[in-house]
Amino acid sequence: MKDKADAVKCLYRQRDKFILIGLTGRTGAGCTTVAKILSTDNINELDLKDSKTCDFKHSDERKYSIVYRFMAEDERWKKFTVIEASSIIFSFILQGTYKNLFNYIDKISNEVEIKEKEELKKNIVEVLSEEKVENIKEIENEVIDKQLADWIKNLNNNPKYVESLKKENLEQLNKMIKYFTENIVTAKNKFKNKLDTITVQEKSKNSKSQNTNVYNLYSYFMQSVGNNIRSSGEYYNNSEVIGKEITLVERINDIVKMINRLEELQNKDKERTRICIDALRNSFEIQYFRDR
């Protein structure tokens, strides 16, 4: 019996080594809520109903009991590291210069009416740099996040960069993972707070038209940025460039590789990588991970 149990364990070992869940659904569908549940440290901290051991009313109760007991035993539960797709979109802004960002805000202002645009630019700079800025012209040629730009350069120049990292690189690997899963989320939320309260009106292309759309500036801005990245590989360029439609998902995959590499180095032969992507909105991006 023990041999059979060991054989089953061996069969499912590969699945246990690496689990990647890509959440998908419209905004407000509950993807972020699910991601928070998956990133919970301990299964006992989850607000789950008790599982039955007998007197099942229907098959779903029985299935729930089996899954619950399986996950609760032998410390099988391990929290998932969450990669927030919107924050990875935001990273494309941070790796560039302030001038790129200013120019893109100017470009957006040709599409929607942004009041006090120059003041908004100044506020954004102060949020991103965490410093008081009197004259934004003085810093416009600076890269917003130099460290991020260096990391991206390494990833672009060497497709095997993550796989080449060794135990002596653990500190750097941890630093990169923390940046992409925590620090950049904080930076994006600060940026969001500056734009989220601003409502903008679409500039009418037809002077006779009385109907114009109204948008939340943050949502409009990030949607445009995401579309451009998927189209050209650059957040400020809306041209269609063949091969660039997977630019965003390739970066997400680089972060997946980082998390998996850290697990390999820290727990050799006992790896249990758990990753959740919140969220995939594009069918090509979903297929990209399915193919892997």
Name each model-derived stretch.
Residues M1-D278, N282-R292:
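Glycine-rich phosphate-binding loop of ATP-dependent small-molecule kinases
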